[in-house]
Amino acid sequence: TLEAISSWFTRAEAPEIAEFSFGTAIEIASRSANVTAVVSDEPGIAFNGKHLTSFVDVMYVLFENAASKSGLPREKLQVTASLCEEPAGSLTLRVANNCEMVADVGAANAAIDYYRDAYGNDDVTRTVIQQNGGSGIFRIWRCLSKDIGIKHTIEFGYESEGLFVVTLKMQEPTGVLYHESIAR
């Protein structure tokens, strides 16, 4: 029936989880992407459980992009993820992966300037998603900006000939953090 078919494309409403850790989102996303990710730094903070799916989506995109764009077989891929709480209160997420060596770091970074320049631009994002079937980087923007509603910046590119890094800085993350006193 039409009702059954439409349910295939609707996310099931799961019982809400009160809180989750960064490590939980990493574990779920890395298993889904079939990527081994090492958590190199994790502050002792908890996120509001209603944002688990969105954070897993963000991490999944980062891991899947690492696997599909690195030019390496998955068994040779090395992914590290870290989350740091900055003194000003922002959170910095850094995901790094090894990749096939690039001859010219500057040229390789210039080749992805379009994505950097377009990130956060609603009109360009819609066009890219419609034409290209959706770029992962724009799915990250949608999850963080639209689904979670957190102000953020993103930097990504080749740090060296064999290392690609994505850094997300989330400003004023209090809305996504779990506060026990508020949850009661």
What are these regions (language model features)?
Residues 136-153:
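Conserved glycine-/histidine-rich ATP-lid loop and adjacent helix of the Bergerat-fold HATPase_c
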Residues 159-184:
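C-terminal end segment of the histidine kinase catalytic
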Residues 84-86, 149, 153-163:
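A short beta-strand-to-loop micro-motif at the C-terminal edge of the catalytic HATPase_c
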